[in-house]
Structure formats: structure tokens, C-alpha cells
Amino acid sequence: MTDLKKAAQRAIELMDLTTLNDDDTDQKVIDLCHKAVTPAGNTAAICIYPRFIPIARKTLDELGAEDIQIATVTNFPHGNDDIAIAVLETRAAVAYGADEVDVVFPYRALMEGNESVGYELVKACKEACGDVLLKVIIESGVLADPALIRRASELSIDAGADFIKTSTGKVPVNATLEAAEIMLTVISEKNTKVGFKPAGGVRDAAQAAEFLGVAERILGADWVSPRTFRFGASSLLNSLLHTLELADAPKPTQGY
């Protein structure tokens, strides 16, 4: 297997296959669940709006794909600074049955010099999550300044984040290697049990390999696993299956 194919295979196993569109429907989420069961193995998770969690759970169970985690989003996409609303949304996501919650850090407040609201929001949402994994989206493409990307990462980890994530995918600049370098460095300094999720803008196996390479250089090859590294993506999967020459392959038979 070529290095590019190896990267494609790994990226599928590390993927949060995502649909977060205003026109999402039950059927689109059902289709996403089916796509997550690929000829190259299952993706790590799907990421959907909270209201679709029950239909996603039912579909994944029917597919015999209970190992695929269900992630959802809160305080999304604008990263408002109302802690009470973020906590209510997070509690609701957990009640719907989410395995993982991706919450947006109040990044605009940080840009205005307010560090405390971000820390307190993440801390409160982690308490609301309990054992549910909390990923914190810092919106690195809007923060832009390396010092702000670093500070948002530090505050999120200090407040209890299980993962730090680059982007919502709803702004012009999403995951970049420069942001990955900063965020992974903060993880190496603070807590190597915290995971990293580049989201948006990773289009093919070559780009996926670049992000994996940065993670391995900073934290070691053994660090990268679904517990510590995810790709947030919607269109990436098709490209990876083409790289693996599996785009038209039959799906594995699972479930009924």
C-alpha cells in the first residue's frame, strides 16, 4: 500500500463524517449514516445537528454500526458568550443521546480581550457533558493571530476540553497547518490526553497526510488514534475512497 493510500485509510478511521447544513433532513442524515459504513471500514463518528440524533442512532443500530460515535454541535456556529444558553444546548444534546459534543468557544469575546467567559463556558459545558466527550471549536481562521489561537487552546484545555477543534466550517478560513502546529504544540505542553480535530478545508489524502504528519512530529506516531485525532469533513470521504480505488466498491454486509 502506498503512503497516500495508507493516509487515506487512516483518515477514514479518524473521520467525523459531517452534515451541518440548514437544509438537512432525516433522509440526508440516514444517507450520511450509510456513507459512514465504507468499504474501507467505518468512520470514527458522524457529526449532525442535535435533532437528528435519534434517527441517526436508529439507523446506525440497523446497520450494525454501533461503534460509530454520534457527535453534535452546540453554541454553533457563532460562538456566542451566553454561558447559560450554551449549557442548556449541551444538556439537550446529551439528553438526545450524543456521544460527543462539539461546542463553539466564544472566540469574538476573546478577540475583544475577555478570557474569562471562554474558560467559564467550556468548564460549564464540560460539567453538563459528564462522560460525553467535549470538543471545543476555537474558530482558528477568524482568530487568525497565532497568540489568540494559542490562548483559546490553552483556556479550552484548562477548562476541561477533551479535544480542541479548529473550525466550524462556516467561515472562509477553516483548518490550516499553521493553526494545527500551534494547537498541537499547546496539547504537547499541557495535556497529551487532549485530542485535536482539524475541520473544514481538508480535501484529499495528501492534505490529510500533512495534518497527520504535523501531529506525529509534535506528539509522536503512537499518539494519533480516534481517541486523540479526528478529521471533521463532509466531502473528504469520497476523495479518500477514490484514492483507495474503492469509490464504486460494494459496501460490507452489516446488520440485517
Swiss-Prot record:
One example of the protein's molecular function in GO is: deoxyribose-phosphate aldolase activity
Q: Which domain of life is it from?
A: Bacteria
List, alphabetically, the Gene3D superfamilies matched.
Answer: Aldolase class I
What name does the UniProt record give this protein?
Deoxyribose-phosphate aldolase
Q: Which GO terms describe its biological process?
A: 2-deoxyribose 1-phosphate catabolic process; carbohydrate catabolic process; deoxyribonucleotide catabolic process
Q: What keywords tag this UniProt record?
A: Cytoplasm, Lyase, Schiff base
Q: Which organism is it from?
A: Shewanella sp. (strain ANA-3)
Please tell me one Gene Ontology term that the record gives under cellular component: cytoplasm
Where in or outside the cell? Answer: Cytoplasm
The protein's Enzyme Commission number: 4.1.2.4
Q: Which family does it belong to?
A: Belongs to the DeoC/FbaB aldolase family. DeoC type 2 subfamily.
Which pathway is it part of?
Carbohydrate degradation; 2-deoxy-D-ribose 1-phosphate degradation; D-glyceraldehyde 3-phosphate and acetaldehyde from 2-deoxy-alpha-D-ribose 1-phosphate: step 2/2
